[in-house]
């Protein structure tokens, strides 16, 4: 959303043009990552002449580097140093100063809400995947993409839209669950007829 708002483009357009989409192997949630440009030495698509073209909207992973952020289910935030051999300039700084330099504290509440959302959805998706037939699994993934990445207006604040999308998503997941239950009942009845 941040990049789309910076570029003034719809979120789906930005995702298709600049990102690689996948489903997390562990989380089973949709994941968007900036797609490296092979012709540019596998660098970020927004790296132009050694500068970030979207610096004001850069992803958290870029703003934090070489630090990484960890958020618990309870919303506790921690930072740690990633091992790096990038060959860049080495400097010493206090974590708080480093984070403030890149305006990380201002977006921490959003990061916490996003992380907690994803952690809760991991559990929900795992349970639903065990119940759903493949067609309903695919529909669920489409709904997740909508709620987490695509159903956003770039002129509106992110968090209220996320909250609205999560309410919508819960309704949609309940509809899919109800459809699956009805199919299961019909299937069970048809098996009973065959067995008679």
Where are these regions (language model features)?
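Short loop/turn segments that flank or connect secondary-structure elements
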Residues: 1-196
């Amino acid at each position: 959303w941040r990049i789309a708002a910076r570029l003034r483009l719809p979120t789906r357009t930005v995702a298709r043009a600049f990102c690689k989409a996948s489903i997390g192997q562990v989380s089973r949630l949709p994941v968007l990552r900036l797609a490296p440009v092979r012709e540019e030495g596998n660098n970020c698509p927004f790296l132009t002449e050694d500068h970030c073209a979207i610096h004001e909207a850069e992803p958290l992973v870029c703003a934090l580097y070489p630090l990484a952020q960890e958020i618990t289910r309870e919303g506790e935030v921690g930072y740690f140093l990633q091992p790096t051999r990038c060959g860049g300039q080495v400097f010493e700084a206090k974590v708080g100063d480093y984070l403030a330099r890149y305006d990380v504290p201002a977006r921490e509440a959003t990061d916490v809400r996003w992380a907690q959302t994803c952690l809760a959805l991991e559990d929900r998706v795992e349970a639903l995947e065990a119940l759903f037939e493949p067609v309903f699994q695919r529909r669920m993934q489409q709904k997740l993409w909508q709620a987490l990445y695509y159903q956003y207006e770039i002129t509106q604040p992110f968090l209220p839209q996320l909250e609205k999308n999560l309410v919508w998503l819960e309704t949609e997941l309940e509809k899919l669950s109800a459809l699956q239950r009805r199919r299961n009942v019909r299937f069970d009845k048809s098996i009973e007829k065959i067995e008679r």
